[in-house]
Amino acid sequence: MKFFALFIYRPVATILLSVAITLCGILGFRMLPVAPLPQVDFPVIMVSASLPGASPETMASSVATPLERSLGRIAGVSEMTSSSSLGSTRIILQFDFDRDINGAARDVQAAINAAQSLLPSGMPSRPTYRKANPSDAPIMILTLTSDTYSQGELYDFASTQLAPTISQIDGVGDVDVGGSSLPAVRVGLNPQALFNQGVSLDDVRTAISNANVRKPQGALEDGTHRWQIQTNDELKTAAEYQPLIIHYNNGGAVRLGDVATVTDSVQDVRNAGMTNAKPAILLMIRKLPEANIIQTVDSIRAKLPELQETIPAAIDLQIAQDRSPTIRASLEEVEQTLIISVALVILVVFLFLRSGRATIIPAVAVPVSLIGTFAAMYLCGFSLNNLSLMALTIATGFVVDDAIVVLENIARHLEAGMKPLQAALQGTREVGFTVLSMSLSLVAVFLPLLLMGGLPGRLLREFAVTLSVAIGISLLVSLTLTPMMCGWMLKASKPREQKRLRGFGRMLVALQQGYGKSLKWVLNHTRLVGVVLLGTIALNIWLYISIPKTFFPEQDTGVLMGGIQADQSISFQAMRGKLQDFMKIIRDDPAVDNVTGFTGGSRVNSGMMFITLKPRDERSETAQQIIDRLRVKLAKEPGANLFLMAVQDIRVGGRQSNASYQYTLLSDDLAALREWEPKIRKKLATLPELADVNSDQQDNGAEMNLVYDRDTMARLGIDVQAANSLLNNAFGQRQISTIYQPMNQYKVVMEVDPRYTQDISALEKMFVINNEGKAIPLSYFAKWQPANAPLSVNHQGLSAASTISFNLPTGKSLSDASAAIDRAMTQLGVPSTVRGSFAGTAQVFQETMNSQVILIIAAIATVYIVLGILYESYVHPLTILSTLPSAGVGALLALELFNAPFSLIALIGIMLLIGIVKKNAIMMVDFALEAQRHGNLTPQEAIFQACLLRFRPIMMTTLAALFGALPLVLSGGDGSELRQPLGITIVGGLVMSQLLTLYTTPVVYLFFDRLRLRFSRKPKQTVTE
């Protein structure tokens, strides 16, 4: 009692304490970063290696495998996947959450160095690594377009000047430049002209290499001067290479221009990028795993004017895509929802108390509690994100509860004629333990969440801590500031009611009287109530088993990502046409604002598209509805598929796939994997629970298989190395020399003229110069025929792997899809040599599903322990926890009604309900125990009186929590798909629990009291103290 008096009789100190809490909160708010969600990105590092012209199988065996063996020894690697395609290998390392990415990067570099001696000697450069997840959607895409400069020149500006500068910005993990390649001098050889002149392709390569040399020449000195020797040993442009003498034939000089077309072009002509039907170079910027997306985007935007000045005026630098506007809009929506919740909660208090003076007290307590929380959030390193702001929105109903309980009890004493300061002291003393019990038991709900590991635990930690801190500050405020304000502001008389509110007051009295009559009937028919309670428990179990489940609500971030997958034998020219066709279909959709895309590189039959939708207030459809509409139009394009998915703020794993969810097949037997993957993929494609089923296994690419006659080769004086060198020189875009410029290095690329690379009969024109100097046609010692070959080889760990990706059709959940996949695998009878498992987000969903029930049980057990300690009783906590089944039924039925799957957000709602609905029982049990202890009442009389006395605060606290959550249900706009499941769960649970627990709690209280007396050694002791 002295504790309460200390604050009630020292108003200045109490006010200054509250002001200090508020000022600290304001300061913390100003320094908090902004993010869409808590930081939950796994540390991911991508290792890249190249060997131009090498087949996917060669890259997998000679490059990927040695690197994987070395990288696999690094501590903390949770997953390692690789993909090898034509001339390129990419290895993705995903680390444990607690692994520092900078330390991991050092280990990766050491592992690359250790594997260097095992890698092919012909690699043009050492493997490199980047601290970014390639499967993440870019946080920003910049485009370069120009009517004056070529694509190669634009690419040079982008990769040489812009990308390095952007990479140095804090938070940027990777800048991927696409749409073309670096400028180069391209030598397109004419096989027939070479044959006529008796010049081999190796002769041309050697001549070019020897003619472009950058070596130190030394210096000359005499007694007084020193001269540096400089020669014209370098050739820079196509015009300088054109007259190069490469051979003499019958005394005549054969120049390069006689046997080849020499042009200033690009290193790889099989690349294309576009933005809104215009050729463009794309800079796709990804953030570091630990970086804040908003701060990173703001830093890039601040740098753009400076970047624009570094490139010519004829080049247009534009932002094609920016993830931050929808994130900011979503957070603004949550902030508005928070303000509405506060207003509704205060309105509830005003309606019940019917006094403006009394309403001011919780109207002050709520903002002090919420604002003070920002200081703790800053100290904990949190951010202002959708989850932390939703925690504050929900906290609105909680923090006002404590103030309501104290205020209502003090007001009751004032109405009885007690003096204000005495009423404040007495009222606070009576409910101080109740408020403490409610707050501690509510915080106890979140202890299992704080101990939960993995991504779900990291995701929910900010929510749990933010809400717990708000409740803790609310507890302090309700026991200090609230009674002080009551003692000094309220008067010892009944509050004056406005005429408009008298009707509401009479309605409350009528409700209370009606409740009293119905409660008397219930207490005389306890068995019926017991059956209802058991029925809610059974219904809970059935609803939880049957309700569709998913990991995280499907977000509408305003950004779509699309993966193009064409026939495996498609040419680059045809693939570029498919990209243009798909872009036109999407660009014509009224909901689309911007489209960028690219194709080419090592994966000739694939491409990527990034689509920015119009703001939510300018379109009526959600992202998923737009995808459903576009899917019908895109399906009409022959020979290729475009798979669209909405970009999410959470994406798990480093696999680049064409859909949101993945199912990976593993095998140590590559032949078995290639046999069963098509069967499984075709089966999954028929399932109605899945959409956009596709696979990264591509083993039906067109190949021209050459078979050497080694005996003939030996007789003709030709070795295999010479024959392979011929093919590489002719068709491998071989980089044969380097051009050194002040800002960059460029290549001289040699191959046969494009008209020959696009014609199979060009092999007939190929020849090799044997050891006698004679030109021997390729057809003399080799035969060729079309065959199938893999376009990519994929590994997970050191096993061969194939990942099947899929999206969810409208109305289907991830639990439906996972169950259907498990049934399909069983029906197919897949052998044990082929193992299937969910990957990425689907894998985390499986793990979360397995732990959900355990988490709920742990939360209930924690609350029971806390209540047992507070009440020094094994029985009364069970009475209080009997309120939970009805809340669970209401929450699950509400989700079913709104056709919302049970997600991680809904799980938060269930956890919150465990803390919310027991408050009613705590208020009843506390007053019943007090009445038995000091009023000499029977248990039935005590609980009946407690129910009637606490009816008004129970209704106030429940409606305050309900109205605090209601704006989440009704909210629209950006981010509403995250807020609504939480609001639906809480509102549904509160409505059902309020209808039932007002009756079930008294019955359970009497049941346990009789049970306690039956087993008690001291039957006369009626109250457990």
Swiss-Prot record:
<feature type="transmembrane region" description="Helical">
    <location>
        <begin position="528"/>
        <end position="548"/>
    </location>
</feature>
<feature type="transmembrane region" description="Helical">
    <location>
        <begin position="3"/>
        <end position="23"/>
    </location>
</feature>
<feature type="transmembrane region" description="Helical">
    <location>
        <begin position="984"/>
        <end position="1004"/>
    </location>
</feature>
<keyword id="KW-1003">Cell membrane</keyword>
<feature type="transmembrane region" description="Helical">
    <location>
        <begin position="463"/>
        <end position="483"/>
    </location>
</feature>
<keyword id="KW-0472">Membrane</keyword>
<dbReference type="InterPro" id="IPR023931">
    <property type="entry name" value="Multidrug-R_MdtC"/>
</dbReference>
<dbReference type="InterPro" id="IPR001036">
    <property type="entry name" value="Acrflvin-R"/>
</dbReference>
<dbReference type="InterPro" id="IPR027463">
    <property type="entry name" value="AcrB_DN_DC_subdom"/>
</dbReference>
<dbReference type="GO" id="GO:0005886">
    <property type="term" value="C:plasma membrane"/>
</dbReference>
<dbReference type="Pfam" id="PF00873">
    <property type="entry name" value="ACR_tran"/>
</dbReference>
<protein>
    <recommendedName>
        <fullName>Multidrug resistance protein MdtC</fullName>
    </recommendedName>
</protein>
<dbReference type="GO" id="GO:0042910">
    <property type="term" value="F:xenobiotic transmembrane transporter activity"/>
</dbReference>
<keyword id="KW-0997">Cell inner membrane</keyword>
<keyword id="KW-0813">Transport</keyword>
<feature type="transmembrane region" description="Helical">
    <location>
        <begin position="897"/>
        <end position="917"/>
    </location>
</feature>
<feature type="transmembrane region" description="Helical">
    <location>
        <begin position="953"/>
        <end position="973"/>
    </location>
</feature>
<comment type="subunit">
    <text>Part of a tripartite efflux system composed of MdtA, MdtB and MdtC. MdtC forms a heteromultimer with MdtB.</text>
</comment>
<feature type="transmembrane region" description="Helical">
    <location>
        <begin position="875"/>
        <end position="895"/>
    </location>
</feature>
<feature type="transmembrane region" description="Helical">
    <location>
        <begin position="360"/>
        <end position="380"/>
    </location>
</feature>
<feature type="transmembrane region" description="Helical">
    <location>
        <begin position="853"/>
        <end position="873"/>
    </location>
</feature>
<feature type="transmembrane region" description="Helical">
    <location>
        <begin position="431"/>
        <end position="451"/>
    </location>
</feature>
<comment type="similarity">
    <text>Belongs to the resistance-nodulation-cell division (RND) (TC 2.A.6) family. MdtC subfamily.</text>
</comment>
<feature type="transmembrane region" description="Helical">
    <location>
        <begin position="387"/>
        <end position="407"/>
    </location>
</feature>
<keyword id="KW-0812">Transmembrane</keyword>
<keyword id="KW-1133">Transmembrane helix</keyword>
<feature type="transmembrane region" description="Helical">
    <location>
        <begin position="333"/>
        <end position="353"/>
    </location>
</feature>
<comment type="function">
    <text>The MdtABC tripartite complex confers resistance against novobiocin and deoxycholate.</text>
</comment>
